[in-house]
Regions:
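A beta-strand/beta-hairpin structural motif
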Residues: 96-98, 106-124
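Internal, hydrophobic beta-strand segments that form the core of beta-sheet-rich folds
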Residues: 128-164
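Short acidic/polar inter-strand loop motif in beta-rich domains
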Residues: 68-70, 115-120, 124-127, 137-147
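A short beta-strand element within beta-rich, extracytoplasmic domains
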Residues: 58-69, 132-138
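C-terminal motif of bacterial Sec signal peptides marking the signal peptidase cleavage site
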Residues: 19-22
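Short coil-to-beta strand junction motifs in C2/discoidin
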Residues: 71-78, 152-156
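Bacterial signal peptide processing site
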Residues: 24-27
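Bacterial N-terminal signal peptides that target proteins for export
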Residues: 2-11
Length: 166
């Protein structure tokens, strides 16, 4: 009887392990950077360096934002720069919806912390292999003001991820 229980435990462990591994098959790169006091400083760019070998298959690129209930806006403006190994650079100003019309945050999560997986580039084929650098900083302003908010509260983590397309 003890032998059967041991085999069942091993079998269940292997099933769980294979499930966990298969869930991450699509992820090529994923990294988060925590922000002190859940505050994103306007003059602090967040950088992610990653290596690209595959220049044939398309990938989906995501900006990942973890916000809490102190985030004061229903949207988020960011400025991104993707630097290529050959010196080329793509700069984008992007807007993402963070809350619905009722003010409920759109990200996933059951607590006050919400995970937002935001499309940055869809089906991107990297033209050259080598080291890439992704930079992001927020560009949030209060209505009617010109200056960027120096300390954006409620942003706990900023991440960047690359996934294989299905």
């Amino acid at each position: 009887m003890e032998m059967i229980l041991k085999k069942n435990r091993i079998f269940i462990f292997l099933i769980v392990l294979s499930f966990l591994v298969s869930c991450n098959d699509q992820i090529v790169f994923a990294k988060y950077k925590s922000l002190p006091n859940a505050t994103w400083e306007a003059n602090k760019s967040i950088s992610f360096e990653f290596e690209v070998e595959d220049t044939i298959l398309p990938k989906n690129l995501f900006i990942n934002i973890r916000n809490n209930k102190k985030y004061p806006f229903s949207n988020m403006y960011v400025i991104t720069a993707l630097s290529f190994p050959n010196g080329n650079k793509i700069v984008d100003t992007l807007q993402y919806q963070m809350a619905d019309k009722s003010g409920n945050f759109l990200g996933k999560g059951f607590t006050d912390i919400k995970d937002n997986k935001l499309f940055y580039k869809e089906e991107k084929v990297f033209p050259v292999s080598g080291k890439y650098l992704f930079n992001i900083h927020h560009a949030m302003r209060k209505n009617g003001e010109v200056n960027i908010i120096p300390f954006l509260e409620g942003v706990q983590d900023v991440g960047f991820s690359i996934e294989k397309t299905e």
